[in-house]
Regions:
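Alpha-helical scaffolding within the catalytic cores
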Residues: 19, 46-55, 75-79, 134, ...
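Acidic (Asp/Glu)-rich catalytic clusters
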Residues: 25-27, 53-61, 79-90, 136-148, ...
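Structural recognition of the beta-strand scaffold that forms the well-ordered cores
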Residues: 32-36, 63-69, 90-95, 152-156, ...
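Substrate-binding cleft of extracellular glycoside hydrolase catalytic domains
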Residues: 71-73, 77-194
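Aromatic- and acid-rich polysaccharide-binding/catalytic face
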Residues: 215-239, 295
Length: 344
């Protein structure tokens, strides 16, 4: 019941965005929101069905968090964000953005994709250069049916600890990455006047590390440039890794006064019968965070979340029933500022 003061990257964020931010910080005291990537678009054995998700097929309820990719954004995805907002859910946007230097038609994968780590960030940072102007055109905002900005969590340069992407550990220097992150924030916030974004950084945390907090803060752009700290956790069955990294991210959250969450996780079509209650829920109860987001269910060989017929389906129903897990119907108004909280 003590007054709480939080700070955001954008002091001019809309009231709804500030309220979402405050609730993301506080909700970890209540439980953990479950999210699923691309859940309204497709699932196992279906594509494009209205108001459907694999999670809803199992539980009758949608995930609390809708994770989607800004890559090839279209009206369908934008409408899913609008519908999620109307129902009271939360949207988090990742961005597998093409390499602006090498992208183009008739390229052989991975040339031109996110996975093409050809160096380009140094060119983007040159004001007025071809790559600088091209990249500025890519950045855009999203609005609801009435033209009001919908609050979203945005993680544009995810897994920057890795070498697979063109903004990552081998394609940029530390100074270039930090400058690039700040360039994105400054352009959206100060030039475009976008005030509905919660800026999230999300290193990949798959192993037990000697200095997990140091890895979480790898190439940290500065407290004034990050709102939310996520981590992408593909640790397989290494429970020690998940526990130790959850402990570290909770410590960072307490120190920085910022919300945190597991922004990607899951086992690719390799769930045990007690996966959700043992491998996922048990550690989260010990080290609570705002959300845990399973990666997508594209097909039976590439499925990270639950679905009917999966070995973990019955266990997920128990996961759903647990008072600690939060799904869409469990959410109070995430876009109303809780009492006793101020944002600066």
């Amino acid at each position: 019941n003590q007054p709480l003061e939080l700070s955001m990257v954008d002091p001019q964020a809309t009231p709804e965005t500030k309220a979402l931010y405050a609730n993301l910080y506080l909700i970890a005291r209540q439980g953990v929101m479950f999210g699923h990537h691309d859940y309204p678009s497709y699932g196992i054995g279906w594509r494009g069905d209205e108001d459907r998700s694999d999670v809803k097929d199992l539980t009758g309820d949608h995930p609390a968090v809708y994770s989607l990719d800004m890559h090839r954004i279209n009206d369908t995805k934008i409408n899913f964000v609008k519908e999620t907002y109307k129902r009271g859910g939360v949207s988090i946007l990742v961005w597998h953005q093409n390499n602006p230097l090498t992208e183009g038609p008739d390229k052989q994968y991975p040339v031109g994709t996110s996975w093409d780590n050809t160096k380009v960030v140094d060119q983007i940072l040159i004001e007025g250069s071809e790559m600088n102007l091209k990249y500025k055109k890519i950045l855009h905002a999203m609005k609801d049916d009435d033209g009001r900005p919908i609050p979203v969590i945005f993680r544009p340069l995810h897994e920057h600890t890795q070498s697979w992407n063109w903004w990552g550990s081998t394609a940029t220097t530390e100074a270039e990455f930090i400058a690039f992150w700040r360039f994105i924030v400054n352009y959206l916030r100060d030039v475009r006047g976008v005030h509905n974004v919660i800026y999230a950084i999300s290193p990949q945390m798959d192993e037990v590390y000697d200095n997990p907090k140091g890895r979480l803060l790898y190439r940290w752009p500065g407290d004034d440039y990050v709102d939310f700290l996520g981590m992408d956790c593909y640790h397989g069955r290494n429970a020690n890794a998940f526990y130790s990294n959850l402990e570290a991210i909770c410590q960072v959250s307490s120190y920085l006064g910022k919300p945190v969450g597991v922004t990607e996780t899951g086992l690719e079509n390799d769930h045990t019968s007690d996966y959700w209650t043992s491998d996922v829920l048990r550690p989260l109860k010990q080290y609570p965070v705002s959300m845990v987001v399973a990666w997508r269910n594209d097909n039976p060989r590439h499925a990270y979340g639950p679905y009917p017929g999966d070995a973990s389906a019955d266990d997920f129903k128990q996961f759903y029933k647990d008072i600690f897990t939060l799904f869409e119907s469990d959410l109070t108004d995430m876009y109303k500022m809780p009492e006793g909280v101020t944002i600066r």
